Amino acid sequence: MKKKWLAAALAGILLAAAVLSGCASTEKAKRLRFGVAGEGGIYREFGERFAALENETDNGQVELKATAGSAANLRLLTGEYLQLAIAQADLVQDAYDQTGIFADEEEDRGFGAVAALYTETCQVVVRADSDIRSIEDLHGRTVSIGAEESGSEQNALQILSAYGLNDKMVSMVNLNYEDAAAQLKAGRVDAIFMTVGAPSPVLTALAGECDIRLLKVDGAAAQRLMSAYSAYNTVTLPAGTYPGQTEEVQTVGVKAVLLASSALPAKQVQQLTQLLFSSREGLEEQLGIPLDPEENAVEGVGIPFHAGAAAYYKAAGITVDQTAGN
């Protein structure tokens, strides 16, 4: 009898351990590290608000990870440290195709698109009392090109190159958005590049503290840029986007894309996609920028979609190229 009791007890313990182990494994699988960026950008603001929505569901608990931006997010997503990330469409395509700054990297690109979220505008800003009137005038000046490993850095280098400028002609420094704004206000840098949804809270705050002017990215240089890099499109910043801005400004922009790891189950990503679009209007109000609806969220992405996102779009009557997921 005693042996039978011990055997039964042992079996019960093993069963409980297996159940607990399974629960722990499931819990771990549902924990989602979400790569955003540092303070002052829309990536961080979007991530905070979307994570709050997701954490109210039983689909997964989101943990935000602050990074330098797009390039860093793509490397961390490829390395399976992140399960979700936001990145600029131009760098997303480079990472997926292993071109550009990702040309020498051999890792498999284990991710798919969820949605294009909004257009990020390339904004080149100087003080209003500066004698800098065009990108060409940045020759011989000190310019913040964004944080190292950020999308802004790559866009700044590409835009400067389109105007015939390089690091021998321009003194380039890597600063995050908030530090760049502070340095411009103090007169320690002559211009700052920011690729971010407009209006940017950092630039709005800066314009309230000192008068600023936005430089145009247009004409033949913009055409060269868009011919060389298909992810760029033309953007017009309306007058009044920022305090003191009395005229519209022509520039270029790229899509910000939400990405998911191939390791995430299709059902989980489908639920995330559903949450994104069912919450779109509320997110727009909180962020102060328009988010793409379903029909626009599949454009300008440049890579196939995660199987879970593809399932969501199929149910909405939209067909997309699919990769990744199970």
What are these regions (language model features)?
Residues 29-62, 120-186, 299, 303-308:
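Bilobed "Venus flytrap"/periplasmic-binding protein-like clamshell domains
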Residues 19-22:
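C-terminal motif of bacterial Sec signal peptides marking the signal peptidase cleavage site
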Residues 41-78, 84-85, 245-246:
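Extracytoplasmic small-molecule ligand-binding "clamshell" domains
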Residues 89-91, 98-102, 130, 167-258:
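Pocket-lining segment of extracytoplasmic ligand-binding domains
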Residues 175, 179, 186, 196-214, ...:
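An extracytoplasmic/periplasmic, membrane-proximal ligand-sensing/linker region
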Residues 104-117, 122, 241-250:
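A structural signal for short loop-to-beta-strand junctions that line the ligand-binding cleft
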Residues 1-10:
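Bacterial N-terminal signal peptides that target proteins for export
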Residues 24-26:
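Bacterial signal peptide processing site
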